[in-house]
Amino acid sequence: MYSQVEHPAGGYKKLFETVEELSSPVTAHVTGRIPTWLRGSLLRCGPGLFEVGAEPFYHLFDGQALLHKFDFKEGHVTYHRRFVRTDAYVRAMTEKRIVITEFGTYAYPDPCKNIFSRFFSYFKGVEVTDNALVNVYPVGEDYYACTETNFITKINPDTLETIKQVDLCKYVSVNGATAHPHVENDGTVYNIGNCFGKNFSLAYNIIRIPPLQADKEDPMNKSEVVVQFPCSDRFKPSYVHSFGLTPNYIVFVETPVKINLLKFLSSWSLWGANYMDCFESNETMGVWLHVAEKKKGRLLNIKYRTSAFNLFHHINTFEDNGFLIVDLCTWKGFEFVYNYLYLANLRANWDEVKKQAEKAPQPEARRYVLPLRIDKADTGKNLVTLPYTTATATLRSDETVWLEPEVIFSGPRHAFEFPQINYKKYGGKPYTYTYGLGLNHFVPDRLCKLNVKTKETWVWQEPDSYPSEPIFVSHPDALEEDDGVVLSIVISPGSGPKPAYLLILNAKDMSEVARAEVEVNIPVTFHGLFKRA
């Protein structure tokens, strides 16, 4: 999958430039042929405003949320985008400065306030951002843009207008929730967030939002906690970006990247800090994996352990003959990868980008296998009996199960990230294919298809072109897992008057089917979905 492609021209810097929203959709110029069955909207979130006046944002996850939409209808494509009217955005525009602290940018107090009003404002509590720049997902008939705090933002998926802010704390006991919920085919939504558990210790709650019922009541009102995972460190919860779900089990991976809660509360309130200032790494804990029975809400009393890694994205999780297979996009070691995602690093010249990436944790896609039943008589033995994997699970004398992975992709400073699968049919089930964004020293420069069984890869790549997360859209009459197309927004700043386009690939061989070009730059986007018409 990887090749030594260089980017000396630095076209990737266009990914991190401020753009204006559009007053109305623009028509894209199509080359190739859009499949007639492809009808609906590609919705994506990302940062679109990287400074407010003279005040810059510093981290990749700080820019103000911009919602994008490509509409497909009868072979034609239009593009639209609007800023999400979050409190963070509206107040910044009103006061012409950064008002709410973001992931890596501290919001300084209003200089017009006197010292006493600024002092007392510190004790009103932490003002959490609602900057919904990470993902968009459905709940019932509604759609929400989200980040990773307790605030999500209801949006209109047709007009991209902002409807209202929603505080998850008013419905369930969580301090925040991930931007990667699982949405089942019946509309049930599962997510995870940290919370205060027993004896004021931190814990992690799995929340369930039911599908829309006949009474048409907002499903958010029926949200509930279905299981609680304990925290390995009383006051330092791990950073959680995603989790695994199968028909019968929930998998939570607790990594050594920790949030120092005391530092979060004291530093933030008293002398000013941002979210990044409150992360630290536990260099000795490694990784703990927790499993719960989904329907009974009961924790499995098995202690799974492995060596340290960062984790942001689960590829897929499934059950097979008494085992859970957990496929992950990992980054080796305990150092936090986000330390390398400051905009100054990402906007640097190519040689400096490579230099910084050489210091960062090494990416690797891995398969872990977790036995669901253990026998003390098997101490010292590998418990994995599945014939198709080299992953091992060894029962130790302290009754922990030590896991060693099977590597399904690894390349020097080349990551297989932002993974997508045929989720509707194969999410939580045995599968063969995953699609990912290829990161070359953190620069996205290819789209990849990976056969997780054979490790065969297919790649789309063009010079000085920078794609986004691939979104798989299944053919409505699909007979095979990879019958469909892959959608990605590509930035190609050196290609003339049309610097960006929506790329459509054949999901079987990653060959180009069509592209829809627009005459505006499109900054980096993180995640999204395809909403069928």
From Swiss-Prot:
Recorded superkingdom: Eukaryota
A Pfam family per the record: RPE65
Swiss-Prot/TrEMBL keywords: Cell membrane, Cytoplasm, Endoplasmic reticulum, Hydrolase, Iron, Isomerase, Lipid metabolism, Lipoprotein, Membrane, Metal-binding, Microsome, Palmitate, Phosphoprotein, Sensory transduction, Vision
Protein name (Swiss-Prot/TrEMBL): Retinoid isomerohydrolase
Entries under InterPro entries matching the protein: Carotenoid_Oase
Annotated compartments: Cytoplasm; Cell membrane; Microsome membrane
Catalytic reactions on record: an all-trans-retinyl ester + H2O = 11-cis-retinol + a fatty acid + H(+); lutein = (3R,3'S)-zeaxanthin; all-trans-retinyl hexadecanoate + H2O = 11-cis-retinol + hexadecanoate + H(+)
Gene Ontology MF annotations: all-trans-retinyl-ester hydrolase, 11-cis retinol forming activity; all-trans-retinyl-palmitate hydrolase, 11-cis retinol forming activity; cardiolipin binding; isomerase activity; metal ion binding; oxidoreductase activity, acting on single donors with incorporation of molecular oxygen, incorporation of two atoms of oxygen; phosphatidylcholine binding; phosphatidylserine binding
Tissue specificity of this protein: Retinal pigment epithelium specific.
The encoding gene: RPE65
Main location (coarse class): cytoplasm
Positions with a binding annotation for Fe cation: 180, 241, 313, 527
Necessary cofactors: Fe(2+)
Residues bearing a lipid moiety (S-palmitoyl cysteine): 112, 231, 329
Cofactor binding, per record: Binds 1 Fe(2+) ion per subunit.
Topology class, membrane: Lipid-anchor
PTM statement from Swiss-Prot or TrEMBL: Palmitoylation by LRAT regulates ligand binding specificity; the palmitoylated form (membrane form) specifically binds all-trans-retinyl-palmitate, while the soluble unpalmitoylated form binds all-trans-retinol (vitamin A).
EC number: 3.1.1.64, 5.3.3.22
Record-listed Phosphoserine modification sites: 117
Species assigned in the record: Gallus gallus
Assigned protein family: Belongs to the carotenoid oxygenase family.
Chain's role: Critical isomerohydrolase in the retinoid cycle involved in regeneration of 11-cis-retinal, the chromophore of rod and cone opsins. Catalyzes the cleavage and isomerization of all-trans-retinyl fatty acid esters to 11-cis-retinol which is further oxidized by 11-cis retinol dehydrogenase to 11-cis-retinal for use as visual chromophore. Essential for the production of 11-cis retinal for both rod and cone photoreceptors. Also capable of catalyzing the isomerization of lutein to meso-zeaxanthin an eye-specific carotenoid.
GO cellular component: a single term: membrane
GO biological process, one term: visual perception
